[in-house]
């Protein structure tokens, strides 16, 4: 009986971890950057999603903020939506990115609007970019948006 390298790795736990993590390719991150709200970042992100869908890519939307814009909402048609996870805070319910649902669904590409968003207290991670990091680590490509004005809030992180 011949043992394969993978069989040996199953026996030795540290190597099993290595096999599982080395064979998973990290997802790519694409960011639509804009100077202010309303300049078309989300609209452009949704346009790219439709182009990818036309090429046969498995694309889902996890968080898309239309801000009441009809043209943007219309572009959501035909894109599978992952429902938000609701977090209760001070008697109110807030929708947040459902990372676990995205990981279970495991699409090729997921849309996550507003990368610099601060999650509701009680969420798994304090910031949405940390949620996105988990999705990327699972090998899923993320397309997101950022307002330049929100980058100033990252000064503390950059200094560290």
Region spans (language model):
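Conserved P-loop
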Residues: 26-104
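Conserved nucleotide-binding/hydrolysis micro-motifs of P-loop NTPases
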Residues: 39, 51, 65-70, 116-117, ...
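Short acidic, glycine/serine/threonine-rich loops at helix termini
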Residues: 71-76, 153-159
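Conserved ATPase-coupling elements of RecA-like P-loop NTPase cores
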Residues: 114-129, 153-156
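Pre-Walker A adenine-sensing motif
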Residues: 15-25
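Loop/turn-to-beta-strand initiation segments
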Residues: 58, 106-109, 138-143
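Substrate-engagement module of ASCE P-loop NTPases
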Residues: 127-148
């Amino acid at each position: 009986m011949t043992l394969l390298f993978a069989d040996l790795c199953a026996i030795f736990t540290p190597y099993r971890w290595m096999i599982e993590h080395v064979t998973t390719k990290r997802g790519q991150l694409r960011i639509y950057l804009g100077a202010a709200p309303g300049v078309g970042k989300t609209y452009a992100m949704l346009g790219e999603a439709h182009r990818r869908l036309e090429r046969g890519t498995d694309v889902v939307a996890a968080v898309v903020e239309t801000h009441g814009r009809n043209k943007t909402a219309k572009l959501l048609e035909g894109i599978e939506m992952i429902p938000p996870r609701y977090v209760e805070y001070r008697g109110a319910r807030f929708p947040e990115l459902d990372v676990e649902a995205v990981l279970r669904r495991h699409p090729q590409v997921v849309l996550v609007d507003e990368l610099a968003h601060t999650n509701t207290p009680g969420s798994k991670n304090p910031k949405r970019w940390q949620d996105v990091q988990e999705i990327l680590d699972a090998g899923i490509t993320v397309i997101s948006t950022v307002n330049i004005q929100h980058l100033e809030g990252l000064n503390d992180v950059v200094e560290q």
